[in-house]
Amino acid sequence: MTSGTRMPTWRERENNKRRERRRRAIAAKIFTGLRMYGNYELPKHCDNNEVLKALCNEAGWIVEPDGTTYRKGCSRPVERMEIGGGSATASPCSSYQPSPCASYNPSPGSSNFMSPASSSFANLTSGDGQSLIPWLKHLSTTSSSSASSSSRLPNYLYIPGGSISAPVTPPLSSPTARTPRMNTDWQQLNNSFFVSSTPPSPTRQIIPDSEWFSGIQLAQSVPASPTFSLVSQNPFGFKEEAASAAGGGGGSRMWTPGQSGTCSPAIPPGADQTADVPMSEAVAPPEFAFGSNTNGLVKAWEGERIHEESGSDDLELTLGNSSTR
């Protein structure tokens, strides 16, 4: 069984076995009746083929040792029946008749279509190779001359100089029979069309032509996004510097959507009403403000400074016994 066929299911296999058992049972009963009531001279312990031969001899048929069967009074057929082709030599006494005609229509002409671009048409054209008038004239003459050979086909189905049968393998001299070669001249390709025809990839961005951006002017104020407005221009500076930057005019935003942090300064909240409140403008107690000198730096709470109070010599390694601590 080839790999392209479908495997039968379990139920289908069971049905096939059941039908085969029934056929064998019927055939066994038929041959049993022929053996019992046929009065044939059969050899001892013979198979069913001998019973079938005796039945054919009684009915007027001759069965050769190789299985060739034909009627009495007729000569043995010269050629045996071809199972695949379905054709055999015609015999007046044979039990089978050959097919009167083939199942396909023979091609009246060649299987190649004539076109003005073909090499065989070069001698039919005139001096002007671009003109189609000589080709149309030759097409009409070809169709009229071959109409008699295709009388079995309707006029609207006939293809002049062609075939409606299966395609024929081209000869070795034909360009279509050769292996197609890959074009290695990559310099002649149009890169702009090659890039635009490629589907976009998450890991590769297509850079369009520079002419697309020739007439585009980037605005100074761009709609704010959370990634730009979370970090101020001077995140660890004083409040006065942020206020002076806001009063001096609106800041310009860099066109770097992939960057964040201090590389892309944010618009102060005074210039952009939709922006989030920066860290320096947030309302917080003065003792927790970073860099403020009013109350000093934030002191550590109890238990934070562990390594500063005890030296390395005072530490003692124990096994967890409370009495040795």
UniProtKB/Swiss-Prot annotation:
GO BP, sorted A to Z: brassinosteroid mediated signaling pathway; DNA-templated transcription; regulation of DNA-templated transcription
Entry keyword set: DNA-binding, Phosphoprotein, Transcription, Transcription regulation
Signal peptide range in chain numbering: none
Keyword set includes Phosphoprotein: yes
Entry PTM: Phosphorylated. Phosphorylation increases protein degradation.
Region feature Disordered, mapped onto this chain: 1-21, 304-325
Location of region: Required for DNA-binding: 6-89
Pfam families on file: BES1_N
Residues the record lists as Phosphothreonine modifications: 169
Transmembrane portions of the chain: none
Highest taxon in the source lineage: Eukaryota
GO molecular function: DNA binding; DNA-binding transcription factor activity
Family: Belongs to the BZR/LAT61 family.
Record-given protein name: BES1/BZR1 homolog protein 4
Classification lineage: Eukaryota, Viridiplantae, Streptophyta, Embryophyta, Tracheophyta
